[in-house]
């Protein structure tokens, strides 16, 4: 029997790894589009600044073809390079397009009509067409310029420092658009605004050179539609990761933004590893987890085998990203989400309520985290030299705070699982943590609920009047405090199915226990309760939100 189990384990692991081709193998060639990329061989800041504005206009032009936008994007991201000719060779690695370099000497005065070099493969008609495209901005672009300030485009730029400040300010906005171009491109840009504010505070982004939101959206759309551009950006991210502490401003900036791009689309996988395997708590020994633990082991081996590009599977549209979808390990994913909702306050904004979420194992995770969060790791305690009395004191301290019995704090006891706004204390300001991203990243892979921006329905007061005052957010952890292990939905009457497996729903609904005979409702303590004492038709309050901070 043991040989069969070992064979099954090897089979599961090899199933994830055997279909990979050799590294660097050339795929079957398909038809390629011709992409013209403009090259400036001079460090003249005036010419480069005109090329920067020219590329922005081509990207935003309403009649530009996809190949025009791709060439403009590659040119735009190559402008800080001292040798554009060599830097653009990164795009030659893409099997998706044929790159044609066009050397440009400058622009005709007062226009965006290109002055090609004698070696440039540009006809007079193409030069005239590019000039028309640069002037053909859509009506959604205000003041006839992609910038928020109308006078920015016509300002003189005769110093390298001026050009670099303007170029980096534009490029950092384009890189921020890359962060969500594949996972949340259609969602409100709340996280992008926070990142813009961060880089303005750091001095990397000058507010005067901000692009209009419509221009930012068009840049994001062009990047999303072009695999060539995203492959080029992946090479740039890998170059930035290899830089040492002494790096130039541009690659230091790219390396910083790359932390938000790495492992996008894999949030569920890494959260499962963090809260299920990382905690090393006893429920991992459940027999139901055995097969899924083998699955996770094979996925970790697959991730390591993919090498450096494993961080950018979503950006590269790699099919291997489907292997990491949580639908392949639903039980241990449900357990990990239960643990995470107790340990990490940011998990409340993560849409973990997928169709395959198992209520039993989610609740096992919740109860395990509540009971085990005060336990002491004996190995760490031995390294610190803690005595048995000190270990007991630490455990009692955590248990007391977890139960809301903290003493000596103004305003009464504090529940660490209630948001600060409910405790009437100043809300904490969290930094932008790149490791914890939105829940939208797995929506395409497993059919889970997409990422949503937070709104609240107005509460209904007694007498049928709607109360539009600010309502306190329902705490999903507090609502689950006394929830028993509820039965499967399939065993419940039809009129009660919709009231099961809802996490953070109506105020008392998740605390109720139903019997099969349809008797009166009881709460978790066996007391008969009135679920909605004021109005039986009371609306639910939805808790949804952003997953960035």
From Swiss-Prot:
Biased composition (Polar residues): 531-542
Gene Ontology cellular component annotations, sorted alphabetically: helical viral capsid; host cell cytoplasm; ribonucleoprotein complex; viral nucleocapsid
Region (Disordered): 517-549
Annotated localization: Virion; Host cytoplasm
InterPro entries found in the cross-reference section: Paramyx_ncap
A GO MF term: RNA binding
Ncore: annotated span: 1-404
Keywords: Capsid protein, Helical capsid protein, Host cytoplasm, Phosphoprotein, Ribonucleoprotein, RNA-binding, Viral nucleoprotein, Virion
Location of region: P protein-binding: 1-398
Binding residues for RNA: 180, 195, 260, 350, 354
Coiled coil: none
Residues recorded as bearing Phosphoserine in the entry: 439
Domain notes: Ncore is globular and carries the regions required for self-assembly and RNA-binding. Ntail is an intrinsically disordered monomeric domain in the C-terminus.
Described function: Forms the helical nucleocapsid (NC) with 12.71 N subunits per helical turn and a rise of 5.3 Angstrom per N subunit, protecting the genome from nucleases. The encapsidated genomic RNA serves as template for transcription and replication; encapsidation by N is coupled to RNA synthesis. Forms the encapsidation complex with the phosphoprotein protein P. Before encapsidation, the newly synthesized free N protein, so-called N0, is chaperoned by P.
Subunit structure: Homomultimer; forms the nucleocapsid. Binds to the viral genomic RNA. N0 interacts with the phosphoprotein (via N-terminus); this interaction allows P to chaperon N0 to avoid N polymerization before encapsidation. Interacts (via N-terminus) as N-RNA template with the phosphoprotein (via C-terminus); this interaction positions the polymerase on the template.
Family stated for the protein in its record: Belongs to the paramyxoviruses nucleocapsid family.
Protein name: Nucleoprotein
Organism this protein belongs to: Mumps virus genotype A (strain Jeryl-Lynn)
